[in-house]
């Protein structure tokens, strides 16, 4: 109330001052009164503006409420009314016929959309002219009144209706046969006489009634028609029935009756062909009669060779591969190819990975620097692998090619084809790491300079990796400190030239060592270790112990070595008898 009272008092004061200013005609006071007029115009009256704001707000709130109400009604209609309508439609004749009808229900079951029973048995079916009539003749007249005088035996038969014969009782089948209607498959009818080429005719099986049909049966007339001409049915092993006698309770088993022209076909039926039961292995190879030894072909590879005499370059173009075996559970492989120019295995090239295919097309070109005089002693080695993101890559097969000079002189438009031979398990090639060690005894500093890595394992689907190097200072199986390099994107031969410095006292240098891991960086998920190498006085690798001893023998001097990367589980421990780092610790 105090706020409203003060506002009202201020408004009255402004009105009073404005009236006084309006009555005073003096020029001196006119300027002073001008500011009161402006103040009144800005602050008073505010009633219409407030009313407009409230009206606009109410309109917005009302509109939003109407929109929300409409959305809620639409969602309710979609969630509640539509499913109930569909459920009701399927129950009232729009859905399939039920098989749980009582034995008294006739062939009609549920007709139209009303869902009313037209007869308690087949004898009262309207199609057969029985005495039963619909409960509402005004709306649904009997089908007997809609038929032409010719009945079922006329020249214009009714459209065939597809019904489920599995639910018919034995009495219903008998009445069907008595009325002159016979069941048949949905395929065209067989003529009653056994013609040539009909193959084999079987008597109906014992047990009475008709054989169970896996699909919907067709009720057609026995009278010949022109609308549905009879076509010869292809030879099958199903039982063909010519007539059904409901009075017989026991029948002999079905026996083959050879017909004219069908003796040879009858002999072929039922014979076992052993060649069809031999297993087919990956790539279409028979596994039943083969020995399965190494060297079996597992696909083919196409490539082209060319030697450049001016630059001493051997150009290799990998074109495609065909009929590779499936290595994954989905029936495909993720193949890629590595090539070496033997006996040098340090320099290698690798194609891109092709996902989910057994016939990859590569079309990639690589060059090897090799003098012409050495080309006769060199061999080209192709290794086809299946890429696996979370485990070791599977070796599909390999091709070793000699006589390179002779093959390189062939026309370039004639590609070479070779069978990919299945080889034994090959040692995992994870790459190599080049780094130097330098120890300063006076300062107590151990400097590890990571220079470069080569031929790293591809960890990404692009055929590359995002590697970085992590060095850990280890003492008695525990990690004391760790240092990391920068990440090099999309490469298998990164160059770092980065120094990692550790504080190591002179009295402790004989009790520590280094674990150096090359890790593939992933933006999503965990980083994966490509390979590790370890150096120190108690390292399991002799090369790692030699490198450490050479560093101690040459203080203040960097000692550089290449180290082969190995898997973490291959090198079970850091020391010869102690506990090493786990793979999880290496990837951190």
Swiss-Prot record:
The membrane topology term of the UniProt record is: Single-pass membrane protein
What GO terms are given for molecular function? Answer: calcium ion binding; calcium ion sensor activity; calcium-dependent phospholipid binding; clathrin binding; identical protein binding; phosphatidylinositol-4,5-bisphosphate binding; phosphatidylserine binding; protein heterodimerization activity
Q: Where is this region: Cysteine motif?
A: 10-34
Which residues are annotated with the PTM Omega-N-methylarginine?
A: 286
Q: Which residues bind Ca(2+) 1?
A: 328, 334, 386-388
Q: Which GO biological-process labels does this protein carry? A: calcium-ion regulated exocytosis; cell differentiation; chemical synaptic transmission; positive regulation of dendrite extension; positive regulation of vesicle fusion; regulation of calcium ion-dependent exocytosis; regulation of postsynaptic membrane neurotransmitter receptor levels; response to calcium ion
Main location group: membrane
Q: What is this protein called?
A: Synaptotagmin-3
State the taxonomy lineage: Eukaryota, Metazoa, Chordata, Craniata, Vertebrata
